[in-house]
Amino acid sequence: MMEHTAHDRELPIRPGWDSVVNIAESRSCFSRFQSCFARPQKLVVVIGLCLLLCSPPPGAQGLPTAADWKTLSNELSGRLHQGVPLARPCFSTYNGQPAAADEEECAAIRHRYLDAEFRANQYAGFYFAQGDGCISNTTNQCQLDPENLGASPGSGLPCNQGLVSPWYVDVRSASDVQSAFRFARRTGTPISIKASGHDYVNRHTLPGSLGLWTRNLRNMTYHATFRPAGVSGAEPVQAITFGSGVNSNEAQAFAGRNNVTLVGPSSATIAIVGGWTLFGGHSVLSPTLGLGVDRVLQIELVTPDGALRICNRQLHADLFWALRGAGAGTYGVVLSMTVRVEPATPVTLALLSFTPTLENQAPFLDLLINNTPAWSAGGWGGPMTSSSLALVSLEQDEAAAAQSMRAAADYVRGENGTVTIEQFPTYSEFYARYIAVSESYVGIGALPTLRVLPKRLHDQPQGRAELLAFLSQRARNNQTPYLFMTPPARYSTPRDSTSMHPAWRNSYWLAGFQSSYAWNASVAERREAAREDQTSARDLTALAPEGAAYPNEASPWHRDWRREFWGDDNYARLEAVKARYDPAGLLRCWHCVGFDDAWVHADPAFECMGAFDGLV
């Protein structure tokens, strides 16, 4: 069965797992975790822009010529486009030069500026302020005031290129990617890869790169029985093959129509095949069904040598291992991914929340810490804070769920909070009710830092005391702890079956905090947000040195990031795979495998993040 998704209207929601604090109503809970130039014949008009902005990797010689770009444009038959900031039509200057504003187009942009679906459907649409604007430079951006979208921006606001790649390819097939890699090998131009635009660390764009945009690879195929290619004796399983542009809403709706359960993101517009899966992918279902990477059966991608490859545990097994944990933007351009699904089954939700005060958060944190091992044994998974929880189980009916949650529910009722225990016929129906329709917070600078905590902090009295003291102090200081019972605590898999840090297999919680800054924050305010983020990362590491950081939601400036993301042994293997498949380093991204720490200050492409490195 083959299906191509339509551009159905969906309410945008915040990505990832950012916050569930102060739930006013149940639907908002999950949200708080969480082409300008298509005609090649006109290429010469703006070729000067890319000659100025496109930069080869360190050590490469020269820049692409006008002839190089013309050749690429002809090969791509109109799918090479100029990358222009989303809000450019609202400004009368661009990159320091006069530029005509387009009031009609600007009005349309202002109308949907905070719409995550709208942003996901534009190459220049990035979810967070640091996605297209330089975090350490207040003028190297082109953004609107999200609090005042009723009028065009004032004449004093800048509109500059920011981090948006000056050229991008609207990828529709493997041949488009192969053409891009030929161009990159010939000219030394680096490649960046963007699917949905959900990225706290900006791995999906790179100044001076040729961007590859995969949003329009939206094929979906259900397999009643799937065997990976070339894997003799493989047990057939239910699976779905997703193109790399399919987002979470589209994927879950498709899974529901095929009566299966899919482990996926808890944000409507995250691409299910992108960085969410390739860097791990934690979900409310992960304690029972594993991480996103644990569900992957086969990957189709184009590597930088231009080869179209099928990867699984038999074919290109080294690459398959590396992709499942460290694969985003690093080893090739993923075109599609086949993931295992399970038969649809009922799911029960426990949703509890109360208004936090200085006095009532520590007792609730104590309840969470002490009940987590038993809840994990009961199949519960999901997000929590010092005043709320939203846990899901495939194993509890409503009566069993009420019994399991009794202590926490009694406490919440005592604080005049709300308690909801509700069962749904399928996970897809739960997703449609609570996640697909959740509200959105786009356009802010969001800097989460989360850490995988070892089980000893829950299983041992001293560990529980240390964890409670740490989180309670942060809560008293008005730093909301974000706690995710989403590591694969009950899911059994061989230790080295993926390139994920081994600490994930010995954990109940992924926990941490978030710093933020406004779109128009001063450099000093942005630096302070970065300092707070780095302080949280340092303190979490001190609390749980044997834990790990999650590449998707770690501090962008994490110390010892190779060890913290993957572990020393894994990283050595990952680097060897990188050298084998991308020896020229055409794919570069911040703190990805192969990143050279010297680039932090030596490479202009990384200067925006690099300016705030080492504040703590």
From Swiss-Prot:
Source domain of life: Eukaryota
GO MF: FAD binding; oxidoreductase activity
Span of domain FAD-binding PCMH-type: 160-344
Enzyme Commission (EC) number: 1.-.-.-
Induction info: Expression is positively regulated by the cluster-specific transcription factor cheR that binds directly to an asymmetric direct repeat present in the promoter.
Coiled-coil stretches noted in the UniProt entry, renumbered to this chain: none
Cofactor(s) recorded in Swiss-Prot or TrEMBL: FAD
Keywords, comma-separated and alphabetical: FAD, Flavoprotein, Oxidoreductase
Top enzyme category: oxidoreductase
Keyword Oxidoreductase: yes
Pathway: Secondary metabolite biosynthesis
Effect of deleting the gene: Impairs the production of chaetoglobosin A but leads to the accumulation of 20-dihydrochaetoglobosin A.
Function, in words: FAD-linked oxidoreductase; part of the gene cluster that mediates the biosynthesis of chaetoglobosin A which has a unique inhibitory activity against actin polymerization in mammalian cells. Chaetoglobosin A and its intermediates are involved in the morphological differentiation of C.globosum. The first step of the pathway is the synthesis of prochaetoglobosin I via condensation of one acetyl-CoA, 8 malonyl-CoA, and a L-tryptophan molecule by the PKS-NRPS hybrid synthetase cheA, followed by reduction of backbone double bond to install desired geometry by the enoyl reductase cheB.
The family this protein is said to belong to: Belongs to the oxygen-dependent FAD-linked oxidoreductase family.
The protein's name: FAD-linked oxidoreductase cheF
Organism of origin: Chaetomium globosum (strain ATCC 6205 / CBS 148.51 / DSM 1962 / NBRC 6347 / NRRL 1970)
